[in-house]
Amino acid sequence: LQYSDSYRCVYRNTAHHSEDDLNHNGKLFPMALGFLEYEEPICLYQYTANRMSYRAADCYETEYVGFGALEGDFCWSVAEDASVFCTLHPDNYLMQFEMGCTIPLEQLGKKELTVSVYVNNALAGELVIDKSNNGGTLSLPISSLLLLDDAQNQVMLRCELWNASTVTPNDKRQLGFPLRSLRFIRK
């Protein structure tokens, strides 16, 4: 395999082989008449090319940090700072955050909920959830200047948590943003 920035060597070793021909020419005691010894390199590569979609159903135990268990096909953020780790090459993108359900703004006594979005600890912008877009897909453009080259990028959602018991009396969780998927579209 030739070098490509789409692959990363995650394991490298050498396999040692030794063989004999076990040719005994019909004699009572088999004796090797030939012996061969050689080594072969072993490389295990991980595919790391641009991954443009991070669905909760596929990533909640790996790339999603600060999110709760999968609920159907989405996860609630359960920490004020919840992150999705992404493999992207620097470029200008439109980030699309698909919500898994609505946030009960009315029961919480709020007209809107603001989610600050950070890319690699730099503020990329804010998503404002209100009655018009609650439960839908929210978009935010990001510049290539915010993305790391040849490294994993962190998209962090920072929002105020609310008590789930406001809606479901026996639910003691603190919840934030219901993320179904994060997608990147090249601009």
Model-derived regions: residue spans:
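C-terminal luminal/periplasmic domains and tails of membrane-associated envelope-modifying transferases
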Residues: L1-K187
